[in-house]
């Protein structure tokens, strides 16, 4: 899919203003084009639509909250102003940069996803990277992480990887995107001393909130998003905000806990977009440090899959991501029947001056 195309036209980059919509009504052509570009790549890599993101999910990623600031940059062949809502201005978009700036921790970091419209062109990458560095400079950010999905053999064959290396980026975490036919999921056998607890959204039952906050902090410590991620304190206010934010979307969250006498021993969750209910996206899976070595990583996934099948009869497949260096979890996924589809890569650039 990715063939480098040389452009002879100048590229113009502008901020989509504002980068979010207060409601989901009438998203602009720029917002829709960015979403279509993201999905086109994932469809090509996976051979289907199960890893795609609905427009509603796209809008949710652009909304600000207390944990992050979001910016969307549009690269086009024509110069002009672009809005997020009620704007059909066509500037001949060639690519977009979705930027996220953490506000509570890692405040020297910026995260970016570059989406290319139709063919990938080095000039578009160069323009988006320059604009990204400008946004970082304004916020005194010095480390950039770019997330990019590639084919299973893409590290050797994808020209975008070569371009990132040439720009000084270093390869970081590589995750494997996998998929499971839910019909193949086996029912769990839960041993004595453990009981499953289920909840929707972000708010667990009151008696488990303290334990839930601790296991989220522990997951951040043990499975950091980047190689230099700082510990993050989770609070009740944070999950209340996330719960309210999720309630505004068409997305539902299914959560499964395994609870013992000391609290939460294992946790996993999955998101279900009702615009595309056939594919369910499994998110975090985490086992408390005190409960490891008992097979709970596999068990909590089976517990979650049963909950998904019970609550969402239209669900047919599970999709998920796991780091390639997490051999234990990859082995669990293989036993469960998940099959690899593509890679999600993270690239790091430290900017001096």
Annotate each PLM feature:
Residues 17-21, 39-153, 260, 264-288:
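Conserved donor-binding loop and adjoining core beta-sheet/short helix segment
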Residues 164-185, 306-353:
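Active-site/acyl-donor-binding loops of N-acyltransferases
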Residues 129-138, 292, 301-309:
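A conserved short alpha-helix in the GNAT/GCN5 acetyltransferase fold that borders
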Residues 123, 295-299:
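Glycine-rich phosphate-binding loop
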């Amino acid at each position: 899919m990715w063939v480098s195309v040389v452009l002879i036209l100048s590229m113009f980059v502008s901020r989509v203003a504002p980068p979010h919509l207060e409601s989901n009504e009438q998203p602009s052509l720029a917002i829709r084009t960015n979403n279509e570009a993201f999905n086109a790549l994932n469809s090509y890599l996976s051979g289907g639509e199960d890893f795609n993101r609905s427009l509603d999910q796209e809008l949710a990623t652009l909304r600000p909250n207390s944990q992050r600031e979001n910016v969307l940059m549009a690269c086009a062949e024509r110069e002009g102003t672009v809005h997020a809502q009620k704007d059909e201005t066509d500037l001949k978009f060639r690519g977009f940069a979705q930027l996220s700036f953490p506000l509570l921790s890692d405040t020297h970091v910026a995260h970016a996803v570059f989406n290319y419209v139709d063919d990938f062109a080095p000039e578009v990458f160069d323009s988006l990277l320059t604009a990204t560095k400008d946004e970082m400079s304004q916020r005194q950010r010095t480390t950039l992480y770019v997330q990019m999905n590639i084919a299973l053999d893409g590290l050797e064959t994808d020209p975008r990887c070569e371009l990132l290396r040439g720009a000084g980026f270093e390869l970081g975490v590589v995750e494997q995107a996998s998929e499971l036919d839910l019909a193949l999921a086996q029912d769990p056998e839960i041993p004595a001393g453990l009981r499953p607890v289920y909840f929707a959204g972000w708010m667990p039952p009151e008696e488990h909130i303290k334990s839930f906050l601790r296991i989220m902090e522990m997951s951040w410590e043990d499975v950091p998003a980047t190689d230099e991620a700082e510990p993050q304190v989770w609070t009740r206010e944070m999950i209340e905000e996330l719960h309210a934010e999720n309630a505004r979307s068409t997305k539902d969250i299914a959560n499964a806990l395994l609870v013992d006498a000391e609290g939460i021993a294992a946790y996993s969750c999955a998101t279900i977009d009702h615009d595309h209910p056939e594919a369910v996206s499994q998110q975090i899976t985490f086992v408390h440090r005190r409960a490891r070595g008992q097979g709970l990583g596999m068990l909590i996934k089976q517990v979650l899959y049963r909950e998904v099948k019970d609550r969402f009869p239209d669900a047919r497949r599970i999709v998920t991501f796991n780091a390639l260096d997490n051999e234990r979890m990859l082995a669990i996924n293989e036993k469960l029947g998940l099959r690899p589809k593509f890679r999600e890569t993270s690239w790091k650039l430290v900017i001096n001056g």
